[in-house]
């Protein structure tokens, strides 16, 4: 709801909410549409009016629907989460061109091997002992975070995004939904991943949207270190709160994601 309200203000969207209640008044689920044409934010109309200028991951759609109910979603989508698979009657996961997302493995039993965790911790220790520093992004201002992200994105990819003001507005309005760490080396930022966080009663979703790092510091593997720090911190937070971790790397677009993640299927909703 906070994201939807933010986007309504930013892009003057006309959202409409559909909510289902049990006979006793208990909330069972709901979803939001953009002007009665498509599911809000993830549809084509939202894309046309500039939603991609804001740093939101739109690779998976989890609808807030009680798993015990069955319902129809009269709008098309190809990114329905497996969480909703049993609840949405008009959905299919076998006829969706094998679409998947990459979800980070757990840092506990059944996740990363002891060898992998030891290697990541050694890399982190080497970085810290050589003049590196780790700073929680919450200690930096929205302007500082936007400047760091844009600078490191350009150093990694060779192009500089032009959405600074949108980033500042987003971070300012949704401060509690931004997560992760910034790496500094000799006082200069060298790695940062833009990650959003959304809390639910049974899980916490983390979306790694994009990031950048200073290629001149490749000897320390800053991209690997910041990834490890963020995934580990997310796991520890979920353990403390007794919730499932859903840490998304998005679509399987690069080989490195399979080293960090397991794949989960995405479904599509069929026309009714």
Predicted features along the sequence, with ranges:
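Aromatic (often tryptophan-rich) hydrophobic motifs at membrane interfaces
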Residues: 177-272
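A conserved beta-strand-loop-helix scaffold within acyl/acetyltransferase catalytic domains
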Residues: 1-39, 84, 88-96, 110-218
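Conserved alpha/beta-domain cores
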Residues: 97-105
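Well-ordered, non-membrane alpha-helical segments in soluble/globular domains
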Residues: 54-66, 82, 116-120, 164-165, ...
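Conserved active-site alpha-helix within GNAT-family acetyltransferase domains
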Residues: 72-95, 248-268
């Amino acid at each position: 709801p906070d994201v939807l309200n933010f986007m309504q203000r930013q892009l003057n969207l006309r959202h409409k909410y559909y909510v289902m209640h049990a006979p006793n008044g208990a909330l069972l689920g709901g979803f939001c549409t953009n002007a009665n044409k498509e599911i809000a934010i993830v549809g084509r109309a939202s894309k046309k009016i500039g939603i991609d200028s804001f740093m939101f991951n739109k690779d998976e759609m989890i609808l807030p629907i009680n798993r015990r109910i069955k319902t129809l979603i009269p709008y098309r989508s190809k990114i329905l989460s497996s969480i909703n698979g049993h609840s949405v009657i008009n959905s299919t996961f076998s006829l969706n061109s094998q679409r998947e997302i990459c979800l980070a493995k757990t840092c506990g039993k059944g996740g990363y091997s002891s060898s992998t965790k030891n290697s990541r911790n050694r890399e982190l220790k080497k970085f810290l002992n050589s003049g590196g520093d780790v700073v929680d992004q919450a200690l930096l201002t929205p302007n500082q975070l936007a400047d760091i992200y844009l600078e490191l994105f350009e150093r990694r990819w060779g192009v500089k995004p032009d959405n600074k003001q949108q980033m500042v507005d987003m971070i300012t309005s949704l401060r509690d939904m931004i997560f992760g760490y910034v790496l500094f080396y000799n006082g200069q930022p060298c790695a940062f991943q833009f990650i959003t966080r959304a809390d639910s009663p049974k899980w916490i979703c983390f979306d790694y949207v994009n990031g950048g790092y200073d290629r001149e510091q490749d000897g320390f593997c800053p991209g690997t270190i910041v990834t490890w720090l963020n995934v580990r911190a997310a796991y520890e937070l979920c353990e403390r709160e007794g919730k499932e971790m859903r840490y998304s790397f998005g679509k399987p677009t690069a080989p490195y994601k399979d080293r960090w993640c397991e794949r989960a299927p995405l479904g599509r909703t069929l026309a009714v």
